[in-house]
């Protein structure tokens, strides 16, 4: 029996998505596209070719309407428009930070008349050598991590594969990142991309929505479509142990662990999921992760909380804990949000912590806070349906200016 089949699958109990009256083709696999084409009368002999044409128009050209798909007959385009859409999530607001970070509030189509539409946030972080898109996997979150703003919003539902891929497509739309003039991804070139990396670090726990996240990332990494290398896709989990091996085995992307503490007692408080999957089990799952090596290290994220987890004793325990794991440690200065109970560690303490880890042989970059002024930094995402009061917004601006 393999490790993938030995462990029970971990899923959220909440499954409240309702199918749309006119479903989107975004997020479907090629076999699923062929099945939908068969459902509207496309001959079996033509389905594979037509599905490939749709795949190209949706994921290479970024078509937003069937009318744009000129290599498909008018008759079939009319049939497609009658039964399906290629709609993305609706952009409700776009905020641009002083540092160039962009945050989009996206409204998802409601499943039925009268149902309240749900919203998620998606963030684009431009840097000199890359452009990283931070994507959400759930509306809200169930984990209740005490330092995370998203954790103050209850879990509403999982996103579909189409809604996850749709975030990438919205970002490419807004940034003008589609190679509209080329016929294949080989001609598009990696160097011309604005979105070079995707991180599953937005709202929600990706491994509590495993199947949809898997299906979405396989589409994003498909080399006949969006074509992002799996080495440029990182999935971050708080430690849903049964699905960690599956992530490497079935998706093959880079893994990041939201660690944040080196003792179970403290991690139980910061990341309550630790009560179910304690550090010993989590670290063993990391050692068993398929493909992990010095060339494909696992990233451990560690938020720096003043007087909580930032001592040199914590740094020593961290080095001991990661023995035998090909790892790098990302130190994250705590990003404040209204009502948070924590403060960011002093900068000199962060540097001492980083230096100790580096001298022990681990890469230990300190993440530069991005988008704090628009509540787009790590741990700050939350649907705008959970409205901030004017007082909270003023407090946020003050915190951003102070830091």
Curated annotation (Swiss-Prot):
Record's catalysed reaction(s): adenosine(2503) in 23S rRNA + 2 reduced [2Fe-2S]-[ferredoxin] + 2 S-adenosyl-L-methionine = 2-methyladenosine(2503) in 23S rRNA + 5'-deoxyadenosine + L-methionine + 2 oxidized [2Fe-2S]-[ferredoxin] + S-adenosyl-L-homocysteine; adenosine(37) in tRNA + 2 reduced [2Fe-2S]-[ferredoxin] + 2 S-adenosyl-L-methionine = 2-methyladenosine(37) in tRNA + 5'-deoxyadenosine + L-methionine + 2 oxidized [2Fe-2S]-[ferredoxin] + S-adenosyl-L-homocysteine
InterPro entries: Aldolase_TIM, Methyltransferase_A, RlmN_N, RNA_MTrfase_RlmN, rRNA_lsu_MTrfase_RlmN/Cfr, rSAM
Coiled coil region boundaries: none
Keyword Oxidoreductase: no
Radical SAM core domain location: 127-375
Localisation per UniProt entry: Cytoplasm
EC number in record: 2.1.1.192
Organism expressing this protein natively: Rhodopseudomonas palustris (strain BisA53)
UniProt main location, coarse: cytoplasm
Cofactor (UniProt): [4Fe-4S] cluster
GO biological process: rRNA base methylation; tRNA methylation
Protein name as annotated: Dual-specificity RNA methyltransferase RlmN
Active site feature: 121 (proton acceptor), 378 (s-methylcysteine intermediate)
Annotated signal peptide: none
Entry's cofactor comment: Binds 1 [4Fe-4S] cluster. The cluster is coordinated with 3 cysteines and an exchangeable S-adenosyl-L-methionine.
């Amino acid at each position: 029996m393999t490790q993938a089949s030995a462990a029970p699958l971990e899923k959220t109990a909440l499954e409240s998505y309702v199918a749309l009256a006119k479903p989107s083709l975004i997020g479907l696999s090629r076999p699923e596209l062929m099945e939908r084409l068969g459902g509207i009368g496309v001959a079996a002999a033509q389905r594979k070719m037509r599905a490939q044409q749709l795949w190209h128009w949706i994921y290479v050209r970024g078509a937003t309407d069937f009318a744009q798909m000129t290599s498909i007959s008018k008759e079939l385009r009319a049939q497609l428009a009658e039964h399906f859409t290629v709609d993305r999530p609706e952009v409700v607001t776009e905020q641009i930070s002083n540092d160039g970070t962009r945050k989009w509030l996206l409204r998802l189509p409601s499943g039925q008349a009268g149902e309240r539409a749900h919203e998620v946030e998606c963030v684009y972080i431009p840097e000199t050598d890359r452009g990283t898109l931070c994507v959400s996997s759930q509306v809200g979150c169930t984990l209740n991590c005490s330092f995370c703003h998203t954790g103050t919003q209850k879990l509403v539902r999982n996103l579909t594969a189409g809604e996850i891929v749709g975030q990438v497509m919205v970002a490419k739309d807004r940034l003008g990142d589609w190679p509209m003039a080329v016929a294949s991804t080989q001609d598009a070139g990696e160097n011309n991309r604005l979105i070079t990396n995707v991180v599953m670090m937005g709202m929600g726990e990706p491994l509590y929505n495993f199947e949809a996240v898997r299906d979405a990332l396989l589409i994003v990494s498909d080399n006949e479509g969006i074509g992002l290398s799996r080495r440029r896709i990182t999935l971050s989990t708080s430690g849903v142990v049964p699905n960690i091996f599956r992530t490497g085995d079935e998706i093959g992307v880079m893994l990041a662990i939201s660690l944040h503490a080196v003792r179970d007692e403290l991690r139980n408080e910061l990341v309550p999921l630790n009560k179910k999957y304690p550090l010993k089990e989590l670290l063993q799952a990391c050692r068993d992760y398929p493909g992990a090596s010095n060339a494909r290290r696992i990233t451990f994220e560690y938020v720096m909380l003043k007087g909580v987890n930032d001592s040199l004793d914590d740094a020593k325990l961290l080095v001991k804990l990661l023995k035998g794991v090909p790892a790098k440690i990302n130190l994250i200065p705590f990003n404040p949000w209204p009502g948070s109970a924590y403060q960011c560690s002093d900068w000199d303490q962060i540097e001492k912590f980083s230096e100790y880890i580096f001298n022990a042989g681990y890469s230990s970059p300190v993440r530069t806070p991005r988008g704090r002024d628009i509540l787009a930094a790590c741990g700050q995402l939350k649907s705008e349906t959970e409205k901030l009061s004017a007082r909270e917004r003023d407090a946020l601006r003050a915190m951003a200016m102070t830091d």
